[in-house]
Design a protein with these regions (language model features):
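A Zn2+-metalloprotease active-site environment signal
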Residues: 3-8, 18-214
Length: 214
């Protein structure tokens, strides 16, 4: 993404002292610079920029289908309380990502690439897993000492993932410093995606089919 404005609320949150929250997935307490309210605020502020950059795919039937599928998965997740938003972006890139607070995106490119609804559910479940496990907030907390400007870029890089999008954010946000999710976070998102598939009567082995795509 060439430009994604950073909400003022994120800067304020990053400048504040850490709070303690309970991770919804692990049940363990963790120190964080982003509580749930801050996650939701960040996602809400960033969402219009994502849609403005890519454009929403102009097919209401497809949008409704993906939203209904995503909502079913989210209702069986560890953070069913969030107001989840699922959007198909008008991009040929094979990509999917999520912002803190329950904003999940898949491109028309990845939808064309996948073979089945179960595979699409696996992709969406993986991204839901990043949100439910608070991976963006964890990355922000670990990077706190890097400075607010660099940290802001790392948060966006973490939630948007590697590849062209992250590279473009890096160029505009903080001198090329953008970090992706860690291997452990990706593995946890895979495991959560498989769990959410099983909870919705899909074969969890479909996660194996989509791991290479993600």
């Amino acid at each position: 993404m060439r430009f994604l404005s950073l909400p003022i609320v994120l800067v304020a949150v990053l400048a504040a002292s850490c709070a303690t929250v309970v991770n919804p997935v692990t049940g363990e307490s963790e120190r964080t610079v982003m509580d749930e309210a801050a996650e939701v605020a960040e996602g809400k502020k960033a969402h219009p920029g994502v849609v403005a950059e890519y454009g929403a795919y102009n097919n209401p039937r497809v949008q409704n289908y993906v939203n209904e599928l995503g909502q079913r998965l989210a209702r069986q997740s560890h953070r069913a309380n969030l107001q989840w938003t699922f959007t198909v972006l008008d991009s040929p890139e094979i990509n999917a990502f999520a912002l803190p607070g329950g904003y999940v995106y898949v491109t028309r490119g990845i939808m064309a690439y996948l073979d089945s609804e179960a595979d699409l559910a696996g992709v969406i479940g993986h991204e839901i897993g990043h949100v439910t496990a608070r991976h963006g907030a964890q990355r922000a907390t670990r990077a706190q000492t890097a400075g607010i400007g660099v940290l802001a870029a790392s948060v966006l890089g973490a939630v948007l993932g590697v590849g062209n999008v992250a590279g473009q954010v890096a160029q505009s946000a903080a001198a090329g410093y953008v970090a992706s999710y860690s291997r452990d976070q990706e593995l946890q998102a895979d495991q959560l995606g498989a769990e959410y598939l099983a909870r919705n009567r899909y074969n969890p082995s479909n996660m194996v089919d989509v791991i290479g795509v993600l």
